[in-house]
């Protein structure tokens, strides 16, 4: 599912923002969440993604045994806005989009029977990628930690910031997560993927539509 900060609904072609494949070694289907995507599940499968400056929240209900993952970054129009933004600026375009990305994941989990008071969260990403918006990773980390605190969501583990991109695998039933540092050879591909996503957000948010939070 793709987060749409302008029209505030899922794009018609949801499958374009995650891919499904069978991992023979693990004997499970795996779903790769792409930038801007959200995926939730109550099935025996693994959710995975690659993260540079973007962040992912992995959230699950250990009683209902449902969980999900998002993959997003905050949209900034220019370096000045990025540099001077802070997480307590709740009405800024960046904060509203970040909140929308989180609420989309939470609401999808609640629709599967999860209870908000039982939810647990693990956070990943926000690396400082050389040559790509020097502060964007830091701002993404600041936002997601502030959001969790403000919403009273329990963060049981996190691996945020630093210089190295990450690969994440997440079991939506148990909340178990695996992390692997991405080799240098893969960094350019991931950077290009995130830059395309960032440019798409810039074009969309320039249209000036309001984001409705729920």
Curated annotation (Swiss-Prot):
One of its GO terms (biological process) is chemotaxis. It is an enzyme of class 3 (hydrolase). The keyword Hydrolase applies. Its EC number is 3.5.1.44. It catalyses: L-glutaminyl-[protein] + H2O = L-glutamyl-[protein] + NH4(+). The keyword Hydrolase applies. It comes from the Bacteria. GO terms for molecular function: protein-glutamine glutaminase activity. Keywords: Chemotaxis, Hydrolase. Belongs to the CheD family. PANTHER family: CHEMORECEPTOR GLUTAMINE DEAMIDASE CHED-RELATED. Probably deamidates glutamine residues to glutamate on methyl-accepting chemotaxis receptors (MCPs), playing an important role in chemotaxis. This is Probable chemoreceptor glutamine deamidase CheD.
């Amino acid at each position: 599912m793709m987060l749409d900060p302008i029209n505030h609904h899922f794009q018609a072609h949801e499958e374009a923002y995650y891919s499904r494949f069978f991992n023979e070694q693990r004997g499970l289907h795996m779903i790769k969440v792409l930038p801007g995507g959200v995926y939730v599940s109550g099935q025996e499968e693994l959710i995975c993604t690659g993260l540079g400056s973007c962040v992912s929240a992995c959230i699950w209900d250990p009683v209902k045994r449902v969980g999900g993952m998002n993959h997003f970054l905050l949209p900034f129009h220019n370096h000045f806005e990025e540099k001077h933004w802070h997480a307590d600026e709740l009405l800024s375009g960046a904060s509203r989009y970040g909140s929308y990305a989180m609420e989309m994941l939470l609401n999808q989990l609640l629709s599967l029977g999860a209870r908000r008071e039982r939810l647990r969260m693990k956070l990943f990403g926000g690396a400082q990628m050389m040559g790509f918006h020097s502060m964007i990773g830091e701002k993404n980390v600041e936002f997601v930690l502030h959001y969790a605190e403000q919403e009273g969501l329990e963060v049981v583990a996190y691996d945020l910031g630093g210089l190295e991109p990450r690969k994440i695998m997440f079991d939506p039933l148990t909340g178990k997560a695996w992390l692997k540092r991405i080799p240098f050879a893969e960094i350019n591909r991931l950077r290009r993927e995130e830059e395309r996503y960032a440019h798409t957000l810039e074009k969309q948010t320039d249209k000036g539509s309001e984001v409705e939070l729920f």
